[in-house]
Amino acid sequence: MYYEPSRRQFLQASTAAALTAAGWAAPTGRLLAAEETKPKPKLKKAVKYGMIGIKGSVQDKFELIKSLGFEGVELDSPSDINRDEVVKARDATGIVIHGVVDSIHWNVRLSDPDAAVRAKGLEGLKTAIKDAKLYGGTTALLVPGKVSNKETENYEQVYERSQAEVRKAIGLAEESGVKIAIEVVWNDFITKPEQLVQYVDDFKSPAVGAYFDCSNMLKYGVPAATWIRKLGPRMLKFDFKGYSAKNGWVKIGEGDEDWPEVLKALDEVGYHGWATAEVSGGGPKELQDIATRMNKIFGLG
């Protein structure tokens, strides 16, 4: 293996020293206030698998993120990764694969005007659900569609088509114990919390909920805490990064997110679960920086 126990200790120590030498300091203002906000929701740190930028086996990668304090990971599906290797790495390291991300939902959309494309997208969602079950995950993240034009893929069409296709996967999700988690992105489809509430509730199934990314939603003008409070128990998972209206995507803790209010809202709705970073990753140094920033915001050990 690349990371034996002594190696992990070395990585932690050397990375911490490197960050100090580089003059990294926790951002002030809202981020500093977030550290002092109480009560805090109980959150567990995770990363997207694609953020782990080292060469080596799945187990090597899992060992690295574990050495940096991450408890979980989210994989893509469908993918060409060796499923047996993933399961063995999970069991060997104790890293939790808490869910998967539908890897084809953006280009092979459930809202596409072509029924054949929608059928292929549905198979992708079903594969994601099956993989999530195999890995022991609880969710399959899905972007249900995209408003691409007014004639063939407008809001109403995206709503109706995606609802129809997702319904075809609900039975499998219920049988598998895996929930379909609807994520809101910059797809011009769902831009208000009330729309996401309605979209989820229209399925009338506990197997469908919301996957919320507070940074994505800053673009649409409604505070993240408002989204969280309106979603309430519908919120299954929580992604975060950093977004600034002035500078675009920034490092975690350097954006416009009102983290103290986000933490307060998470606690109010009883969200205690995974907090998954979705940012540019890298090697040990970059991943350690991400972990440190998450710890500063969420007060995690």
Identify the residue ranges that each predicted region occupies.
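Histidine-acidic metal/acid-base catalytic patches
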Residues: 2-46, 51, 55-66, 138, ...
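Hydrophobic anchor at the start of a short beta-strand
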Residues: 45, 97, 180
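Short, surface-exposed acidic/glycine-rich loop or hinge patches that mediate macromolecular interfaces
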Residues: 52, 78-80, 187, 284
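Structural motif corresponding to the early beta-alpha repeats
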Residues: 71-164, 216, 246-249, 272, ...
